[in-house]
């Protein structure tokens, strides 16, 4: 008897998260899926993308501000470069909206 994992691709994970948001269980799900270090890394990645999209600081300044390596900033920058302007605009708007709610 061979067993296969039920979750095999990224879209299934995205759907799991979407479903957890719909049922107000997203915080519980993400807390259970990610270690404290992973959550900290994800927070850093969000801040990296946010700062890169703002375009006000150099990669070195972002690295110093967030306490992450320059290679981490470069990976975020490379990921952004692979996206269309429309995708970047959507992400920037989403980040701005959430930042306004948090203030």
Curated annotation (Swiss-Prot):
Keywords: Cytoplasm, DNA-binding, Repressor, Transcription, Transcription regulation. It is found in: Cytoplasm. This protein is an aporepressor. When complexed with L-tryptophan it binds the operator region of the trp operon and prevents the initiation of transcription. Belongs to the TrpR family. NCBIfam families: TrpR. Homodimer. This is Trp operon repressor homolog.
């Amino acid at each position: 008897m061979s067993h296969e994992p039920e979750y095999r691709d990224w879209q299934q994970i995205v759907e799991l998260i979407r479903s957890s948001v719909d049922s107000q269980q997203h915080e519980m799900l993400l807390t259970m899926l990610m270690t404290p270090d992973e959550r900290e890394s994800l927070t850093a990645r969000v801040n990296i993308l946010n700062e890169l999209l703002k375009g006000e600081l150099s990669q070195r300044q972002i690295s110093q501000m967030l306490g992450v390596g320059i290679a981490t900033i470069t990976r975020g920058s490379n990921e952004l470069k692979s996206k269309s302007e429309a995708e970047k605009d959507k992400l920037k708007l989403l980040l701005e909206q959430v930042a306004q709610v948090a203030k």
